Amino acid sequence: MATTLTTAQSLTAEGIADYGQDLRQLSAEELRALFAFASSGKINATRVIKNLIWQAYTAIRDGRRAPIAGNLRSFWYTDIKPVLSRLGVPVEGRRATELVYDAFVELVTRHHLFHYRDLGFLDEGAQTRAVGQTNGTCILFAEKDGRFALMREIAQAYDATALALGGYPSSLATEYLVHALQHAGVLAERPALQLFAVVDYDPSGYWIAREFTAQLHAFGVQEVTLHPVLSTIKWQKMPFYG
């Protein structure tokens, strides 16, 4: 049986503390004293990022800071990149921003310390999401945004839910989807969803569908059944892999 950690235990496990000073305003020397490994002197970038995220959340929660009103990338530029640059941590390339995305996933979906929406992030997936009522728990979703109009047309015929992921599923967008389903009253006490995945017949499409399923589980949807649907025309005569 899994043990549920308290908030204090989760924060300790992640190396997060309630510092009295705004970490964004500290000098490189002050930051190094807090976040350098004792053995090597190298900066623990992941711990820096998680503490910056926690400070942003608590400041917004307590009314000491306005909501982000942007996306994760804008948060990277305003809160994370300047601090890491000051510490000499590499900030160019995809891996640097992925550290931020990974940190949020840990804090939001593993430890459940807060919601993305608590920080005021934009619901960028709202434009490619249409929640049904009668069959709202049946979700027809596409890998690519360009297929959203088709997904919506088909879903509307059955008052189901239509969605386009825009590529690899975003944990932030998935949270907003679940929140929208809850707000619409289509998720029962024991949440269960039927997913109809319109993805490419390739390894990427396979993993996109399954990652989306895993994210829904992480946000409390207990039962998720995935029904893969073949989308790429050149493969239409071939059986879909499950």
Residue ranges of each PLM-predicted region?
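Nucleic-acid enzyme cleavage-core boundary/entry regions
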Residues: 1-193, 206-242
